[in-house]
């Protein structure tokens, strides 16, 4: 592996369970050199958990600083505004052939500050330029414009997102379809794969970030997409099992591998 440089375009979780903390921890555990362009800051205020987007000019300066860095993989997380998303899209368009994993964060668990309706259409523009998208079930509903109540609904939504331009889709169903199983659906444009794990009760902040950054790490190292997804799901499952009140624990998950 000659080039182990991998980038995360993601926000800062003040409690370090998700966002860039999860991305960098996952990259480190995979032996990779992680870079970050920060899309937003977060804080717990009297209003609740708030997201503060990075100023457009500052975010562009971040990306300009990385213009000459040769990345072998990119993971995209929370893009809090359309303007930040536009700049991120321009950045990845300049890197054809680099594996890109898009975690299309549209609904934060803690807040509705993200402008969901505007970001939907902007994120769809990313689809032809990424390797795989990893929406959770509510995000898949918004992007596909349909309700998802059954496994067949998940498959139909994955097909629709593929038709919108995503080469591959994995919808993270969590325990919405089953109380005792976490069910995900992976679609590569030809075949569906259903992935299941027993549900672990407790804090899972950072699970989606870790999942996407783990997939990006495995793609960089040469794994095929399905293998990357399966390995990443297993890793996240172990990390959730080690979670504390601030989120999942990547390092402990790796030690218990």
Predicted feature descriptions by range:
Residues 115-191:
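Conserved phosphate/ATP/ADP-binding segment of small-molecule kinases
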Residues 53, 226-257:
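Charged C-terminal helix
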Residues 77, 91-118, 129-139, 164:
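Juxtamembrane transmembrane-helix boundary motif
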Residues 1-2, 8, 19, 179-194:
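Acidic-glycine-rich active-site phosphate/pyrophosphate-binding loop
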Residues 141-142, 201-225:
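Short, small-residue alpha-helix embedded
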Residues 10-15, 192-205:
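Short pre-catalytic strand/loop immediately N-terminal to key active-site residues, enriched for Gly-Thr
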Residues 31-35, 192-193, 218-231:
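Phosphate-handling active-site elements
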Residues 2-8, 20-109, 256-257:
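Conserved N-terminal subdomain of the carbohydrate kinase-like
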